[in-house]
A protein has these predicted regions:
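Non-heme Fe(II)/2-oxoglutarate
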Residues: 2-96
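Catalytic core of non-heme Fe(II) oxygenases with the double-stranded beta-helix
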Residues: 87-217
């Protein structure tokens, strides 16, 4: 699947998605700063974000701040600072969720390697992934990876160099205020910060739904 890079927003014109869309400098700077100021004082992180397969094996546990559950049900009274982010995602790209499934912030430090998983099995799904950190060094790692659609069906799980070499179809660097729009039925993973990153905390704001439609906004 092709990766397309942009410097400004645009209206999506096809579902299922026919490309991985990457928008740099996405969120307005003042809003981005306001969001991160609110995030810093919202102490709702939990260390129980896992990837567990059908046979019960768990291959990933990372930090997570849960924000909205299915049908945009708030996870608590602390989440409203994040609602405008989701609204802007939908408005900027002409999307309406007919079935919204989840929003939250994934967090990784050194050693918390993301492992291969899918977000959806439905054709008209959308996953938004916003790199919400305000600072990130190019040498810290943290790449987002996408794999061939049938990789999990072939029994692959976890993360390995073999997986990257034989099944990876896209690799996108972590960059502050970068937004990725991807078909969540493609397996994907996120690298942890590497050993050059010190105490860096790699954060990704995730909003996804199993069923979306294009609207003219």
């Amino acid at each position: 699947m092709q990766v397309k890079y942009y410097e400004s927003v645009f209206k999506l014109d096809t579902l299922p998605l026919d490309a991985i869309h990457v928008i740099d400098n996405w969120y307005p700077k003042d809003n981005w700063v306001q969001f991160n100021n609110a995030l810093k004082v919202t102490n709702r992180w939990s260390f129980d974000n896992d990837v567990t397969y059908e046979d019960g094996e768990t291959t990933e546990i990372t930090w997570i701040m849960r924000l909205f559950r299915k049908w945009m049900k708030p996870a608590g009274n602390y989440v409203e600072f994040a609602r405008p982010v989701i609204e802007q995602m939908c408005n900027d790209f002409g999307i309406e969720f007919e079935q919204f499934d989840f929003a939250g912030i994934n967090g990784q430090t050194q050693g918390l390697q993301g492992t291969i998983h899918k977000d959806s099995f439905r054709p008209r799904n959308i996953t938004f992934l916003w790199h919400c950190n305000t600072e990130w060094d190019n040498n810290w790692g943290g790449k987002f990876r996408v794999y061939q659609k049938d990789t999990l069906d072939k029994g692959h799980r976890g993360f390995s160099e073999e997986l990257v070499e034989n099944y990876q179809i896209a690799e996108i660097e972590y960059k502050p205020n970068r937004l990725i729009i991807v078909d969540g039925s493609y397996p994907h993973s996120a690298d942890a910060p590497n050993n050059k990153s010190g105490y860096a905390f790699r954060k990704t704001f995730v909003a996804r739904g199993n069923v979306a439609k294009l609207v003219d906004k």
